[in-house]
């Protein structure tokens, strides 16, 4: 069953293959139930290898007698979701770059996960900085070891004439499981067209960074 040319894996359906309980190694030959006289039968969940060229067509993995092979998906190489999730020029961390070719789940980057930012828009562009108003990323930094968003700035900066994106709010160090940004007193100068506060108070929600501002801070 094994083939040296194989680079991918086919999984044998658990309900279609059994081996004698006295010999459960993956490399042994599987025979019919009549050959296992006096032995009970158990499910063999060992992975079997097969030769799958780039087409990934079902014909590349022809089922053997009494076996059903699950090779998938068909034409996976032609799908944009089957390309490696990261490249050498990607801002993502290379240590977590895992190719997603031939996997049924698509459009879910597996490498674009910096320390405090979790992408939810199915594209690696989430790892790019988004000023003040995150679109694809949502800071999830309210954890003891995770209080500095990497790809998205905290949600405390509101775009307004009296706020400066670079100096409005900065996240404080994490306390327990809550992380709250603090406002610097000099971040907002009241004007005729502006509200006197650059940071709008918001309640802190678990696992989310929310601004926590007092009226005297700005």
Swiss-Prot record:
One GO cellular-component annotation of the UniProt record comes to:
keratin filament
Key word ATP-binding present: no
Q: Where is this region: 16 X 5 AA repeats of C-C-X(3)?
A: 26-202
- The keyword Transcription is assigned to this record: no
Pfam families registered for this protein in UniProt:
Keratin_B2_2
Spans of sequence repeats, please give: 50-54, 55-59, 60-64, 86-90, 96-100, 101-105, 111-115, 121-125, 131-135, 136-140, 141-145, 151-155, 161-167, 168-172, 187-191, 198-202
Record's superkingdom? Eukaryota
Cited InterPro entries: KAP
Q: Which UniProt keywords apply?
A: Keratin, Repeat
Q: Where is the signal peptide?
A: none
Role summary: In the hair cortex, hair keratin intermediate filaments are embedded in an interfilamentous matrix, consisting of hair keratin-associated proteins (KRTAP), which are essential for the formation of a rigid and resistant hair shaft through their extensive disulfide bond cross-linking with abundant cysteine residues of hair keratins. The matrix proteins include the high-sulfur and high-glycine-tyrosine keratins.
Family from the record: Belongs to the KRTAP type 10 family.
The record describes its quaternary structure and partners as: Interacts with hair keratins.
State the protein's name.
Keratin-associated protein 10-8
């Amino acid at each position: 069953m094994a083939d040296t040319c194989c680079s991918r894996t086919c999984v044998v359906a658990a309900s279609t293959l059994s081996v004698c309980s006295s010999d459960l190694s993956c490399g042994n030959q599987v025979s019919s139930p009549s050959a296992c006289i006096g032995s009970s039968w158990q499910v063999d969940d060992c992975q079997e290898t097969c030769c799958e060229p780039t087409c990934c067509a079902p014909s590349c993995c022809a089922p053997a007698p009494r076996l059903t092979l699950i090779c998938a998906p068909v034409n996976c190489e032609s799908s944009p979701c089957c390309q490696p999730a990261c490249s050498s020029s990607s801002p993502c961390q290379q240590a977590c770059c895992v190719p997603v070719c031939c996997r049924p789940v698509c459009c879910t980057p597996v490498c674009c996960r910096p320390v405090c930012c979790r992408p939810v828009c199915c594209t690696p562009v989430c790892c790019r900085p988004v000023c003040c108003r995150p679109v694809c990323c949502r800071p999830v930094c309210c954890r003891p070891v995770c209080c500095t968003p990497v790809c998205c700035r905290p949600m405390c900066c509101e775009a307004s004439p009296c706020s400066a994106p670079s100096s409005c709010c900065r996240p404080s160090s994490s306390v327990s499981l809550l992380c709250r940004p603090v406002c610097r007193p000099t971040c907002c100068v009241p004007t005729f067209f502006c509200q006197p506060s650059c940071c709008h108070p918001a309640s802190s929600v678990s696992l989310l960074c929310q601004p926590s501002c007092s009226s005297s801070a700005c």
